[in-house]
Swiss-Prot record:
UniProt superkingdom: Eukaryota
Protein species of origin: Homo sapiens
InterPro entries (UniProt xref): FKBP3, FKBP3_BTHB, PPIase_dom_sf, PPIase_FKBP_dom
Name used for this protein in its record: Peptidyl-prolyl cis-trans isomerase FKBP3
This enzyme's EC code(s): 5.2.1.8
């Protein structure tokens, strides 16, 4: 027996309003969308985690798409659902061949940020500001490929943080985007997908392989 077709809960204006939390839209989609629909739109999993990676435009598009395609819960057979979910997973695992230059509808950010030490919550860098950072970069197996943090006392005394203009393409995009969300004094762990790191080519000189997901611990010590 087919499930009852849900009614639209919000108007377009309400969906785009800041008063409507992303979590409410995700909850609605998870309650009413079929598993394969949710998998295609990367909406499966813990609501809090999905809210971290999905932006509002992506959720609004998914909400409208759900009603256009009528792919509600209970409308697909189990075998079809598992096949589609499997296909989506396989496609996600393959390196993307689409043009990385395309900026329209990029979907959720290609990085996640975990705060290790809170900053002052008042001084945030803007595009074009010079930021000063200590950092350590590791591959998924834990290999450190780059750091400016010195361990010996002598080197530590002469060490200087990395300084660059943020948000203007001087560093990988994952850094540019993440640092704009950090406040002075904040230390965070950044897990950056290949698309916002070194992509399909990698960085052979730094021993970074193609399609590598990178992890950085970054401390924003100052902003000019």
């Amino acid at each position: 027996m087919a499930a009852a077709v849900p009614q639209r809960a919000w108007t377009v204006e309400q969906l785009r309003s800041e008063q409507l939390p992303k979590k409410d839209i995700i909850k609605f989609l998870q309650e009413h969308g079929s598993d394969s629909f949710l998998a295609e739109h990367k909406l499966l999993g813990n609501i809090k985690n999905v809210a971290k990676t999905a932006n509002k435009d992506h959720l609004v598009t998914a909400y409208n798409h759900l009603f256009e395609t009528k792919r509600f819960k209970g409308t697909e057979s189990i075998s079809k659902v598992s096949e589609q979910v499997k296909n989506v997973k396989l496609n996600e695992d393959k390196p993307k061949e689409t043009k990385s230059e395309e900026t329209l509808d990029e979907g959720p950010p290609k990085y996640t940020k975990s705060v290790l030490k809170k900053g002052d919550k008042t001084n945030f860098p803007k595009k074009g500001d010079v930021v000063h950072c200590w950092y350590t970069g590791t591959l998924q197996d834990g290999t450190v490929f780059d750091t400016n943090i010195q361990t010996s006392a002598k080197k530590k005394k002469n060490a200087k943080p990395l300084s660059f203009k943020v948000g203007v393409g001087k560093v990988i995009r994952g850094w540019d985007e993440a640092l704009l969300t950090m406040s002075k004094g904040e230390k965070a762990r950044l897990e950056i997908e290949p698309e916002w790191a070194y992509g399909k080519k990698g960085q052979p000189d730094a021993k970074i392989p193609p399609n590598a997901k990178l992890t950085f611990e970054v401390e924003l010590v100052d902003i000019d």
